[in-house]
């Protein structure tokens, strides 16, 4: 009998769905990847090349969806009727939260390509600005006055990313909810060692956001941890008049 070739689960998922590169770890670790009908949560699980693999890709089940949803509840922020920018949209977890909470339109901004889920691509309320850096936004790309901004900028510090949004027009009373990733804010490339690192990262992010023309209302710890258990935060701001 010929030897069955096996790969690590993460590698096999990416072989079949390369567009999931930015979310594959989250999908596996949160039980959204099924091998022969059973959820597998170890990235290194060996799977046969011909195994049946199913991936649940509903944004409501993504960790990002839960992060923003719970943060908006804690911060008392309403998205009803807003026209929003979701910077760092990726698969669209934050975008889906905004839509579920009544957003009129969401500009989903993502430097990558092919990540936004098909259901969101087909939603007439979503403007898909993939292959677009936040620094490339203009009033021509985003002609509407923006009343809400959500950010999950990956490896770009908020102090650098948020000022780049100033090329668009903001509506009076516009609000911002920015996810703080300590590794990005501190430039360490490592998970924060203790609470002081998280606090320092959040403080730096808040200072950068304030310098970009926002009044910082509140900072909180994210109620949902990031990949590999990373402690993250949120900054809530309101556009200064």
List where the protein language model places each region.
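S-adenosyl-L-methionine
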Residues: 107-160
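Conserved beta-strand signature within the Rossmann-like core of class I S-adenosyl-L-methionine
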Residues: 172-187
């Amino acid at each position: 009998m010929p030897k069955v070739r096996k790969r690590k689960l993460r590698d096999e998922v990416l072989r079949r769905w390369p567009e999931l590169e930015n979310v594959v770890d989250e999908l596996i670790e949160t039980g959204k990847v099924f091998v022969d009908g059973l959820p597998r949560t170890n990235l290194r699980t060996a799977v046969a090349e011909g195994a049946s693999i199913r991936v649940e890709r509903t944004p409501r089940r993504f960790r990002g969806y839960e992060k923003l949803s719970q943060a908006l509840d804690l911060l008392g922020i309403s998205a009803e009727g807003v026209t929003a920018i979701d910077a760092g949209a990726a698969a669209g977890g934050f975008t889906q939260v905004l839509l579920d909470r009544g957003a009129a339109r969401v500009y989903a901004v993502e430097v990558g390509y092919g990540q936004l889920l098909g259901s969101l691509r087909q939603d007439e309320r979503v403007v898909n600005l993939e292959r677009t850096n936040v620094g490339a936004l203009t009033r021509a790309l985003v002609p509407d006055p923006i009343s809400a901004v959500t950010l999950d900028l990956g490896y770009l510090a908020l102090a650098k990313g948020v000022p780049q949004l100033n090329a668009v027009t903001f509506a009076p009373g516009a609000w911002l909810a920015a996810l703080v990733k300590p590794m990005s804010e501190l430039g360490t490339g490592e998970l924060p060692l203790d609470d002081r690192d998280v606090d320092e990262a959040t403080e730096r992010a808040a200072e950068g956001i304030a310098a970009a023309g926002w009044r910082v209302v509140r900072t909180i710890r994210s109620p949902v941890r990031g990949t590999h258990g990373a402690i993250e935060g949120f900054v809530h701001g309101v556009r200064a008049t």
